[in-house]
């Protein structure tokens, strides 16, 4: 099982690198990377395209209007993070379970495989 898991992880890492390379932002802050502790961080409106957010702690982070296109969210903790108006188009390894723990609104752009949770403000 360990060998199989290691092989799968290698493929996930390669996929992440290929996807994120297409969208890397030269303006992305250096403090944002794999495993970053960004609990309560003020990241509103930042260009985070192609960010490696694997295992990042984004609990209660302010990501309103942030550009998170093609970012890697595998294992990221986004509980109570504010994704209102954020663009997560093309993000990889972002799950419905993660989205369900975050906050957002009708202006949040999600990958097509995910749905806006019922608790988000949708201005219907």
Residue positions per predicted region:
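Terminal amphipathic alpha-helical/low-complexity segments used for targeting or macromolecular assembly
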Residues: 1-26
């Amino acid at each position: 099982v360990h060998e199989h898991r290691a092989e799968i992880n290698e493929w996930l890492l390669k996929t992440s690198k290929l996807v994120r390379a297409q969208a890397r932002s030269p303006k992305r802050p250096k403090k944002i990377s794999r495993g970053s502790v960004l609990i309560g961080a003020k990241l509103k409106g930042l260009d985070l395209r192609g960010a490696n957010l694997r295992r990042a702690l984004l609990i209660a982070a302010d990501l309103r209007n942030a550009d998170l296109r093609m970012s890697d969210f595998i294992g990221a903790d986004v509980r109570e993070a504010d994704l209102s108006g954020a663009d997560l188009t093309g993000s990889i390894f972002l799950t419905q379970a993660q989205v369900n723990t975050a906050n957002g609104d009708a202006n949040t752009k999600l990958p097509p495989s995910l749905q806006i949770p019922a608790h988000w403000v949708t201005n219907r």
